[in-house]
């Protein structure tokens, strides 16, 4: 994982600690967010900030994990374009992203990276019947979808879907991967994205009645 990603994350967290820009936005959005998310009654904005920090900081670890697993199972050449693209979301963001900096801008990029990895993970399950990542980011990604706002998040989803479709056509690679001994190893236990936050500060989706 390029050191530039970690440096970008550190800089954004440092800027947020000085400006509180994202915290102020969340305070304004709180009434709308509470319609979609189950937040702790005590300090809900602090819980959201902890969740966002964990979500953003988990990107380098996820990229590193996909790199290691794909190399071990012999399909790194297949995964590499996705990994490079996820890195580029941080280092060379696409034009669809607004030029806002700080932690708010980084959340946009982290959402793109995590959603792209989710697409790769789904494809891995389809072909090998086990997940690539030991962390299920599905719920976390839906939560961030709500934090970004439906209209903007949907545009980012469409970008990821279009990009993934361009890269997921090389099905012949999976025939080779399925024949590798490593693909028959016991699957790594999958933990849910709620582990991104402290147990006392869980953010959950509010299910429609």
Q: What residue ranges belong to the model's regions?
A:
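Terminal, membrane-proximal amphipathic helices
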Residues: 1-82, 118, 122-209
């Amino acid at each position: 994982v390029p050191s530039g990603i970690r440096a970008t994350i550190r800089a954004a967290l440092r800027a947020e600690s000085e400006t509180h820009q994202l915290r102020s936005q969340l305070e304004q959005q709180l009434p709308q967010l509470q319609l979609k998310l189950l937040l702790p009654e005590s300090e809900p904005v602090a819980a959201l900030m902890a969740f966002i920090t964990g979500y953003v900081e988990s990107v380098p670890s996820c990229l590193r994990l996909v790199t290691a697993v794909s190399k071990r199972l012999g399909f790194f050449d297949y995964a590499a374009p996705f990994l490079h693209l996820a890195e580029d979301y941080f280092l060379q963001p696409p034009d669809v992203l607004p030029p806002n900096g700080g932690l708010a801008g980084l959340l946009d990029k982290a959402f793109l990276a995590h959603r792209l990895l989710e697409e790769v993970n789904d494809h891995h399950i389809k072909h090998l019947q086990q997940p690539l990542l030991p962390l299920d980011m599905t719920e976390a990604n839906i939560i961030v979808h709500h934090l970004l706002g439906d209209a903007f998040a949907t545009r980012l989803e469409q970008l990821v879907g279009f990009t993934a479709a361009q890269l997921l056509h090389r099905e012949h690679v999976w025939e080779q991967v399925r024949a590798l001994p490593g693909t028959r190893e016991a699957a790594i236990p999958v933990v849910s994205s709620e582990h991104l936050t402290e147990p006392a500060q869980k953010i959950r989706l509010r299910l429609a009645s």
